[in-house]
Amino acid sequence: MGKEKTHINIVVIGHVDSGKSTTTGHLIYKLGGIDKRVIERFEKEAAEMNKRSFKYAWVLDKLKAERERGITIDIALWKFETTKYYCTVIDAPGHRDFIKNMITGTSQADCAVLIIDSTTGGFEAGISKDGQTREHALLAFTLGVKQMICCCNKMDATTPKYSKARYEEIVKEVSSYLKKVGYNPDKVPFVPISGFEGDNMIERSTNLDWYKGPTLLEALDQINEPKRPSDKPLRLPLQDVYKIGGIGTVPVGRVETGVIKPGMVVTFGPTGLTTEVKSVEMHHESLLEALPGDNVGFNVKNVAVKDLKRGFVASNSKDDPAKEAANFTSQVIIMNHPGQIGNGYAPVLDCHTSHIAVKFAELVTKIDRRSGKELEALPKFLKNGDAGIVKMIPTKPMVVETFATYPPLGRFAVRDMRQTVAVGVIKGVEKKDPTGAKVTKAAIKKK
């Protein structure tokens, strides 16, 4: 056994019919951990249902259906391996909550793979004002996904097939858009592929012999290795809290920064509840320490399940413990709000795993979203396309941090009317000190 490969997380984005599922399914199918028996079962069902286009999207549809029905799928199904990396696809696109998950979830995407439908009409629909291609790319950039790979998909269905001219037209247009968003298009590989036929996915395609760049697999291998923030203080937003017979209370979540280990005394924000960590587990194995990116369950002593909730944040009681935010100042970009947003607006904020209404207490300035320069002080309102600095007050206790210190806890989506109306990053937080927070016996002993 050589050195274990680095794990990286990938978010697949693009317009609704661009072929995200087929492309992702194809990678997982060819390079992934899907059990051959499962594939055979899917193939048989596909044949019975006469789904010629089965191949790969079907695999993903099955996985998604099982996931949505709450059947926990072995998450290995969403993994695949390149020469250099273990890759996890952190969201299956086309999912209702995709945008929300992107915001709460992309915190840990190391690279976005943007899938473009290269067919006549398909590309134009995706990149149009209403298309999702733009929104997804903007979101990915705002939320700190610095690396991108662009796949010009469905090259087998361009006119003429595998058209170099069409590819070049798309590269030109998408590059200019990505540049506006903030990416450097010279650093973004544009790979012409067919997710269905498999051209340039893994092996080079003779159909595209005019293209000299990397295949999708090679482009994934060229991703810069991410630096994991294990030297920062612990921040672990809770996704769920379970009561497990014979063990007790087990909060579950992903370590975003720092490390968590047995024997550590943790403080949960926003309440300040403090207790000792008895054990830490990942995939049913005990760990001596968990690092950023690890999804773990950990057992805490003398704590009732009702004292912890999704959205609470575990932190090291001795190293910058998490606290409730009294208010915070954010830079927001209004993405799709039908009217105008003024002081007093109270939408829901999705930040890490919390989902809480906040009040836009004061619009401080309106700024140019490209340069960050101030355009207007104390504007009356912000509308679509505007960016501004806003002071916000949570309506319930919540933990947020500045984007500069703890990026995953410093970015958010503003949701209203069942859609993402804005995204933002947090510039400053005024914190409250907890009063009368419970400190368990186990924690006192450790002091």
From Swiss-Prot:
GO terms for molecular function: GTP binding; GTPase activity; translation elongation factor activity. The modification 5-glutamyl glycerylphosphorylethanolamine is found at E289, E362. Residues 14-21 are annotated as: G1. The modification N6,N6-dimethyllysine is found at K55. PROSITE patterns: G_TR_1, G_TR_2. Residues 153-156 are annotated as: G4. Keywords: Cytoplasm, Elongation factor, GTP-binding, Methylation, Nucleotide-binding, Phosphoprotein, Protein biosynthesis. GO terms for biological process: translation; translational elongation. Residues 70-74 are annotated as: G2. Residues 5-230 form the tr-type G domain. GO terms for cellular component: cytoplasm. Gene3D superfamilies: P-loop containing nucleotide triphosphate hydrolases, Translation factors. Residues 91-94 are annotated as: G3. This protein promotes the GTP-dependent binding of aminoacyl-tRNA to the A-site of ribosomes during protein biosynthesis. This is Elongation factor 1-alpha. It comes from Triticum aestivum (Wheat).
